[in-house]
Amino acid sequence: GLEEFQISIGNVDFFQSLIEESEIDDETEERLRELINNRNFFGADELLEEADAKPVSRKAFSALSEMVGGVEILEEAKKVAPSKKAMKAIWRLEKIYAILSVYKMEQYITFDLSMSGIYGYYTGIIFRGYTFGTGDAIVKGGRYDHLVEKFGKAEPAIGFAIVVDELMSALSRQKIQISSGEKSSLILYDKERLKDAIQLAMEFRGKDKNTQILQKASDKSLEFYVD
């Protein structure tokens, strides 16, 4: 499979905390999201100036242009975090990085605090995956805890979409062939054995075995998980 890729992770709550502190109206917010999504930070600053946003908010939004990179940018983000909500968003990203470090995935991870969830339904973690040989992300996703409510049921959720055309283009240009028909292994673990489960899964994957891990529910027997 793909060996050269980057997963860019953000937290919509950080961006949203900046919005809340700026006290801008809905129309300005929509335009601001669009500008920052297009990485037009100069235009974003002009918009905030016209909207008479707080100077501290303008400074925080301007800093977003530099909030892209390795785990070290999370420390920089703390310097401009305007609220406890923003700090919690950063702490959440740090926790995710700690788990990914157990997987030894650090080299594939970057952070982008300017991710705003332009569609408006993301509520926390948001991510995109990139590789060379494509013009766009090959995977996009995140949390959308309130989206299902619009269809009649309150249910937290997380999901992602694989952009098949971009993925196939990347595989072709990188001359990668994918075998099919392989069976997958499932590793069940108790909550306190997460690190052991990850290490075992890495051993299996190192032998080209498709492997998934899943925390065992305390009220379920092993038979419940047998296909």
Locate each region found by the language model.
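A structural signal for short, well-ordered beta-strand segments and their strand-loop junctions
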Residues: Q6-I9, T110
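Class II aminoacyl-tRNA synthetase-like tRNA-binding/catalytic domains
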Residues: G1-Q6, L18
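Short acidic, glycine/serine/threonine-rich loops at helix termini
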Residues: S17-S22, Y122-T123
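Short, conserved phosphate-binding/catalytic loop or strand-edge motifs used
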Residues: I9-S17
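Acidic, His- and aromatic-enriched active-site or binding-groove loops in soluble protein domains
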Residues: I24-E46, M105
